[in-house]
Amino acid sequence: MKLSVMFIVFLMLTMPMTCAGISRSATNGGEADVRAHDKAANLMALLQERMCPPLCKPSCTNCG
């Protein structure tokens, strides 16, 4: 359940950035795409950190 919510949030955060990056990539050589990708990756990492406890047990469904 939490993984699917996390995936939906990830899509919501990355899609607007990706679309904006594509329209700006013609003027700055794709630099906007790289920044959008980095920002999305950082946000996804933060979401994953918040979903798992610091000491993850094998029974934890949020830990991969």
From Swiss-Prot:
Gene Ontology, cellular component aspect: extracellular region; host cell postsynaptic membrane
Modified positions (Cysteine amide) in chain numbering: 63
Keywords assigned by UniProt, alphabetized: Acetylcholine receptor inhibiting toxin, Amidation, Disulfide bond, Hydroxylation, Ion channel impairing toxin, Neurotoxin, Postsynaptic neurotoxin, Secreted, Signal, Toxin
Post-translational modification: May contain a 4-hydroxyproline.
Tissue specificity statement from the Swiss-Prot or TrEMBL entry: Expressed by the venom duct.
Propeptide intervals in chain numbering: 21-50
Domain of life, source organism: Eukaryota
Subcellular location: Secreted
Outcome of mutating residue 57 to A: Exhibits higher activity as long-lasting analgesic in the hotplate pain model in mice
Cysteine pairings via disulfide bonds: 52-60, 56-63
Signal peptide: 1-20
Annotated site residues (Binds AChR) in this chain: 57
GO terms assigned for molecular function: acetylcholine receptor inhibitor activity; ion channel regulator activity; toxin activity
Family: Belongs to the conotoxin L superfamily.
Notes on the domains: The cysteine framework is XIV (C-C-C-C).
Free-text function comment from the UniProt entry: Alpha-conotoxins act on postsynaptic membranes, they bind to the nicotinic acetylcholine receptors (nAChR) and thus inhibit them. This synthetic peptide displays analgesic activity in a hot plate assay. Analgesia is also observed against second phase pain in formalin-induced inflammatory pain model, and in a rat model of mechanically-induced pain. Effects downstream of nAChR are inhibition of calcium influx, inhibition of ERK1/2 phosphorylation and inhibition of c-fos/NOS expression. Genes associated with drug dependence are not up-regulated by this toxin.
Entry protein name: Alpha-conotoxin Lt14.1
Organism per entry: Conus litteratus
Phylogenetic classification of the source organism: Eukaryota, Metazoa, Spiralia, Lophotrochozoa, Mollusca
